[in-house]
Every structure is written in structure tokens, then in C-alpha cells.
Amino acid sequence: MKKKLAALLLAAASAMVFTGCGSSDNQSKGGVDKKVQIEYWHVASESFGGTTVKELVADFNAKHPNIQVVEKYNPDMYKGLTQNLQAAIASGKNPDVVQMGWSYLNYAAENLKYTDLQPMIKKMAPEDKNFWKEIYLPNCLALAQTDDGKQIGIPYSISVPVLFYNPEIFTAAGLDPNNPPKTWKEVVSAAKQIKEKTGNMGFFMQEYADNWTQQAIIESNGGSMLKNEGGKVKAGFDTPEAAAAYQLLADMVKDGNGLHATNEEGFQAYLSGKLGMVCTTIGKRANFEKSAKFKVMAAPFPQFEGKELKVPAGGNFLMLFSKDADKQKAAWEFIKYIESPEALAKWSTGTGYLPPRKGVADDPNGFKKMIEENKNIQVALSTMPNLVKWASFPGANGLQAEQLLIDARDIILSGKETAAQALHETAEKINNLL
């Protein structure tokens, strides 16, 4: 599955493979007859694609006088959005189009009253009945499918974790900026050398309200986030491999070479030239390149020696929650627009996310040229063969399970418990919930 998924996404981003795709520009077909207002919920802050969201919404509204899209930013990433969404659904005030994080896919399918897109399209927009086949390949659609194969949304944003670094700090520390760390052993060594030679902090790994990059380091060391025992999903991270990976991060913090802080603090330290390396999503590329006081450079997510690199596909997919027929029709027009090659090229350029559909790499607005000229994008694309699915805790307690593992991160990185202790205790708690 991993190789097929990687091949698909490489193909979707490669101009050499696709020369075009089915059109999604029939926004007027099956259009809305009266003025309809819909809400679009997202997690794009001002420094993480928020400006691009506003531009896309404004462009859509200008082209569709009978539809008014109101965008709403939800803080605390996908956990915060999902919690807000639950409250909205409970009060009967559903948003219409929602960016749902991949790690909440199973939870959303089992616990949120979403609108099934495929039968809705068949009924209200039959001219788009082949949208899925024309726009995406089967394995790409599978990203937004539950474990039992139910399609609950449409792929939108694809990201991978990468290692951004400051070449000026590398040079000052006696490191070669053209030969960045390839393994975690080299990351630890580089972080120590940066601190000793320059006084700057060496390393920071993002601390969003999720476990995305932590999954990458755990599974790249041979561990697992989840396991299936007798048909039941359980926590899989109570292993020596997972503990060793997490302890490596904690030891860097303990030794004074790694940073345990909020994202705002960590990212600002990097952008202001006071941090050598930051491990985070390629989705931060555009903001970093615009805001940094130095040339931003990226390297692939580090490996463990002799072990296979595994990076979870980050980002989000689009779900529909409209119940009113007019809102459903309007929401579908908006989804088609933001999934169009032109809009996706703007979204990818304004963020760093990789496009999930055919044709975007050949977009006349220049994303093809950007891929060819931007080495940081090329770095992200190079890790596509190592993609795995972002682990998603199932069941009604999935959100609570996710939060327990987030809490364990703080316990481990603050040195309150060893990684082995914290992961063992957390696994027991999660298994009692699932």
C-alpha cells in the first residue's frame, strides 16, 4: 500500500507523468439559483496558509455571485477543529465544508454526522458523477477512505515532515550546509556542535496538538503507533523501538541541545537565526522562506541507520456537513473550485503542501516551474516513496486517546519520566479506552 500510495502522489506532482486532467471548472453547471451562504472551516493560521485561504475564498465569491463563502480559522490544529465541529453539530449549526486531518479520519467516520458526498453528487450534480475517476487515481482517494473502504471525503492537502536548517549557523558551527544530517545520530551530533560552537540551540521538533512527527520518528525506528490484535486496534508504541526514538528527542533536550517549547517559540527561534534545525511539515515552507532572515534549506526527514524511513502523509481532506440542499449544492461548487488545478497551485505555492490530484504540476500559473526551481519542494517529493498513513485512533474515545499521547510527549520531553515509562503507561490508558 505504501509503495502504491507513494507512486500515486509522485505521479500527481510530476509534470512528466500527467499532461492534464478532467476539467473541474463547470461551476455553473447545477449552479445555485439564489444567494446562499456557506461556512468553510480550516486550520490555516496567518503564518500557515491563512492568507491564501482568504485569497481563494475571495476569488470564488467574486466568480459566484449567488454563493457567499465565509471562512473560519480554527486554532489548535485538527484537534481543536474537531472539538469545535462536535459542538457545532450538537447545536445544529453545522459548517458546510471542513478541512479534516488525516489522523481523525476514522474518528470522524464513526462519530460525526457528515454528508455522504457520492450519493449527494449523483442526485444533485449528475454531470459530476465521474469527478472521482477523472480527478484522482484510486490510491489517492484511498487516503480519505476508512479502513473498511468507505469514502468520507476528498484529498486536499498532502505534506511530509522535513528537516529545515539554517546554513549560516551550520557554517558558523563548522558544519557543511550542503551536507545536512541524514541520520538521527548525525542530527544529535550536529545539534551538540551547533550549541557548543555558536551558543544557539541545535534542534526543535514541532509540538502541534497531534503526534504526526512523533509517528515518523517512532516508525522510522521500527516501532508502530497502532497494532491489530484479534481484530481489535490497540496502541502499538509500547516497544523498545518506540521508546528509543522518543528518548533520543528527550536526551537532546536534557543535554541542552534540543528545544522543548511551543511551536511559536520554536519557529520564531529558527526564523530569527537562533536555532539550527527544526523538524516540521513542508507545509511551513512558504512562510519560512518569506519570513526567515537567511536562506531556508531543507533536508529529508532523518533515518535511523540500517532502518527504513517511514513518513506519515500529513495534511487534510475535505468533508461535507451541509444538510440543506441549497447549501450542499453551493458547497459542492466550492469544493470543485478549491480542488481545481489553478486553485490547488495557489494553495501549494502559498503553503508548501503538495497537490493530491492530476494536472497541478502542469498548471499554467507556474507550479511546474516552482517544483523545478525550488529545492525544498524537491526534498519533500524525494521522500514520497517512504509514505505511510497517518495513524488514526478509532472509536468514540479516539480524541481522548490522541490527547493522552500528546500529553505523554510533554511528560517525556520535560524529563518527568523516561520514554519507556511514559509510553507504557499511556498505552495501557489508551487500550482501556479503545
Region annotations inferred by a language model:
Residues L143-Y156, P161, T171, K185-K234, ...:
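Extracytoplasmic/periplasmic solute-binding protein
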Residues D59, K63-Y136, A172-G174, G276-M277, ...:
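Extracytoplasmic "Venus flytrap"/periplasmic binding protein-like
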Residues V188-Q193, G231-H260:
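Glycine-centered hinge/linker elements that transmit conformational signals in sensory
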Residues V43, E55-V57, T213-N221, A244-E333:
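Extracytoplasmic/periplasmic substrate-binding proteins
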Residues M1-E39, A62, K123, Q421-H424, ...:
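Short, low-complexity disordered leader/linker segments with a strong preference
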